[in-house]
Amino acid sequence: MASTKERENFVYVAKLAEQAERYEEMVEAMKNVANLNVELTVEERNLLSVGYKNVVGARRASWRILSSIEQKEEAKGNDVSVKRIKEYRLKVESELSNICSDIMTVIDEYLIPSSSSGEPSVFFYKMKGDYYRYLAEFKSGDERKEAADHSMKAYQLASTTAEAELASTHPIRLGLALNFSVFYYEILNSPERACHLAKQAFDEAISELDTLSEESYKDSTLIMQLLRDNLTLWTSDIPEDGEEQKVDSARADGGDDA
């Protein structure tokens, strides 16, 4: 069993790595903490999340750029360029798959078993939903469906616990609603369901705004603003009665997430 000092050292290294923007090393340091089979503190959870979000975020951005260039070259009929771009895109997809697989293992084998119910449980099931959603962004066919199904189940589990145990203004519950609604919009191509979920979360939080603690006020109101921004963006995609629904399933960035 690692000593408290070793645990503190891993956390300190993670903080240093974050400051130096060396996110792969930040992730490794926090994986060392997770592997201790201990319940993570709020600070440790956030360090782990920030590390992985930056590691995966860089690849997601690369994938979007490459996909856009690939489409433009295809439209021009530049087959040689398309072949090169596709090879490069597949390399990025392989990296994305490995990162997502890595965090799933950490969540399933260490984090969820070591966590109490309530806030930590919501946090990690939300995280699981997020990383399966990231897989569904670039997978196709059966692999995409499988990733989407896993994402849906994780978000639903997180939502059930959040609604039972967290206030409607809690930043983790709001962040979950934000990301789950993005899942409906981007992955399931359902702007109606996305808007319903986002609006419900926003309205419930507004009605309880006076109960918001000072420490979480900034985080909660920021996420509420993102929910409102997405609602504004998505409402235009909801078809009028009798009008054919037109949603671009390959949209590069359908809304903000937490």
From Swiss-Prot:
UniProt signal peptide: none
Basic and acidic residues bias: start-end ranges: 244-258
SMART domains: 14_3_3
PROSITE patterns linked: 1433_1, 1433_2
Origin organism lineage: Eukaryota, Viridiplantae, Streptophyta, Embryophyta, Tracheophyta
Region (Disordered): 237-258
Family: Belongs to the 14-3-3 family.
Gene Ontology CC annotations of this record: cytoplasm
Pfam family, one: 14-3-3
GO BP terms, alphabetized: protein localization; signal transduction
Organism: Glycine max (Soybean)
Protein name: 14-3-3-like protein C
